[in-house]
């Protein structure tokens, strides 16, 4: 299992969204996408998830073009920064709606409820849940299709310390199951705790790609947090 990104580009009204960007991700990697607001991090993930289309370039998973929406649903799970759940529906109904839309067996919904310790909350409406539980539902929904690749946009945004630690454990468990994970982050401690590799975007361009040790010893890291 591997991702190949070649010349992926997105411009917004002639402004930088993502300049031509190329890199690959191999099975077993947990990649942090780092950079300031507006660097292109979310744009990159949304293109990989087929939420937005690139102006040019392409991305592939095991030779399958991610512009193919059916392939994306099967191969890629996307967890946006703000959970896009139906607040007035229950946890279980949110998952069942997604499963129905993509013809996922109902047994998979029950498995996700169990795996993510959501059974006690299955009849709760989303609006009744804490931020941490909402994020757990958000992640569970992304895993309903059993994707090979998971994309997380600022996964701990708005979570308190205990919720953040719980989410770290959950992400590590998902990674240990053999999935590729890419996540965006502003937090140095999050990158240290999770990433096996770090990619830095600046003003839409890729300026660093290396190990956590290389990153934290680099001028790129110093400049990123000095500015």
List the model feature ranges, each with a label.
Residues 34-36:
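The feature captures the beta-strand-to-loop junction immediately N-terminal to the Walker
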Residues 57-67, 72:
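Conserved ABC transporter NBD signature motif
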Residues 96, 100, 106-122:
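Conserved ABC ATPase "signature" region
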Residues 150-153:
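Catalytic Walker B motif of ABC-type/P-loop ATPase nucleotide-binding domains
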Residues 161-163:
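Helix N-cap at the start of a conserved alpha-helix in ABC-type nucleotide-binding domains
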């Amino acid at each position: 299992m591997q991702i190949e990104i070649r010349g992926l580009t997105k411009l917004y009204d002639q402004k930088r969204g993502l300049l031509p960007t190329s890199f690959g991700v191999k099975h077993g990697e947990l990649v942090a996408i780092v950079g300031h607001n507006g660097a292109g991090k979310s744009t990159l993930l949304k293109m990989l998830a087929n939420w937005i289309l690139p102006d040019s370039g392409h991305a592939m998973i095991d030779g399958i073009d991610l512009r193919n929406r059916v392939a994306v649903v099967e191969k890629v799970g996307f967890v946006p920064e703000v959970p896009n759940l139906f607040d007035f529906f229950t946890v279980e109904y949110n998952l069942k709606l997604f499963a129905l839309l993509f013809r996922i067996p109902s047994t998979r919904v029950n498995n996700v409820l169990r795996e993510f310790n959501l059974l006690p909350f299955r009849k709760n409406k989303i609006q009744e849940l804490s931020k941490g539980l909402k994020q757990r539902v958000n992640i569970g929904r992304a895993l309903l299709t059993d994707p090979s690749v998971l994309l997380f946009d600022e996964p701990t945004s708005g979570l308190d310390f205990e919720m953040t630690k719980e989410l770290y454990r959950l992400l590590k468990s998902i990674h240990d199951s053999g999935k590729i994970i890419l996540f965006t982050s502003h937090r140095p401690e999050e990158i240290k705790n999770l990433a096996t590799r770090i990619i830095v975007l600046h003003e839409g361009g890729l300026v660093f790609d290396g190990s956590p040790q290389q990153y934290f010893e680099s001028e790129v890291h110093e400049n990123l947090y000095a500015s």
